Amino acid sequence: MDAFIRFTNQTQGRDRLFRATQYTCMLLRYLLEPKADNEKVVMKLKKLESSVSTGRKWFRLGNVVHALQATQQSVRATDLVPRICLTLASLNRVIYFICDTVLFVRSTGLASGVNKEKWRRWAARYYYYSLLLSLVRDLYEVSLQMKQVAHDRAKREKSPSQDTLGYSVADEETEWLQSLLLLLFHSLKRHPPLFLDTVKNFCDILNPLDQLGIYKSNPGIIGLGGLVSSVAGIITVAYPQMKLKTQ
């Protein structure tokens, strides 16, 4: 309960709850739309989704500052690959939030001359770049974890006193995929923050992929991905130790 109270008291926490609500509405709307007798429910879900989306804009007005702070932190990373990926990802996120703020100002009627479609496409593009770079960082961290697990497994296999049932070497020719997936599973299992960050970024990237026409998805897939991503974000805000740290 204390963790939940701390969570709701944070701006990021409230934004994650609003985001989860928004994508839940999108997913439910997609599931209910084919049925003709659900028109009223679908309309209510659509209005709630729109209202929650607008409410989230107020929580995100300070995100440009947060993204700049994240850029400063990523520059100090000791490992070269995370430093480059996170710095560029944060810079792209700054541009994305600027575009998002311009779109929000336009929606209030203060800048009606702004080309909505152009700015929306710019926002989607820089959001995509940010997530893509974050995923590259995640994959790099996963590869390091897999190397460590493989090293530990090799040490276990050399020791006759250790139980190697879960770490048997798969036949290189016939079971290489099974061995790789098992190695990936153990790597993510021993590093939950990396698992959450990878899942979150993968689910998030579905939206800009659809908006940019790179990979088209339906609202149900985007809604489900957004909901899963929001739950992962809620966990990292409520339990900071589950957030992937910059080395």
From Swiss-Prot:
An annotated GO cellular component: peroxisomal membrane
Query: InterPro entries, per this entry?
Result: PEX11
Protein name as catalogued = Peroxisomal membrane protein 11A
PANTHER family, alphabetized: PEROXISOMAL BIOGENESIS FACTOR 11, PEROXISOMAL MEMBRANE PROTEIN 11A
Location in the cell reads: Peroxisome membrane
- Identify its membrane topology class: Multi-pass membrane protein
- Could you list which ranges are Cytoplasmic topological domains? 1-83, 240-247
What keywords does the record list, in alphabetical order? Membrane, Peroxisome, Peroxisome biogenesis, Transmembrane, Transmembrane helix
> Its quaternary structure?
Homodimer. Heterodimer with PEX11G. Probably interacts with COPB2 and COPA. Interacts with PEX19. Interacts with FIS1.
Q: Which residues cross the membrane?
A: 84-105, 220-239
Q: Which Pfam families match?
A: PEX11
Q: Where does the UniProt entry say this protein principally localizes? A: membrane
Query: Which family, according to the similarity comment?
Result: Belongs to the peroxin-11 family.
Q: Which residues lie on this side of the membrane: Lumenal?
A: 106-219
List, in alphabetical order, the GO biological process terms annotated in this UniProt record.
Answer: peroxisome fission
- Residue ranges, annotated region (Required for homodimerization, interaction with PEX11G, and peroxisomal localization): 220-239
What does the UniProt record say this protein does?
A: May be involved in peroxisomal proliferation and may regulate peroxisomes division. May mediate binding of coatomer proteins to the peroxisomal membrane. Promotes membrane protrusion and elongation on the peroxisomal surface.
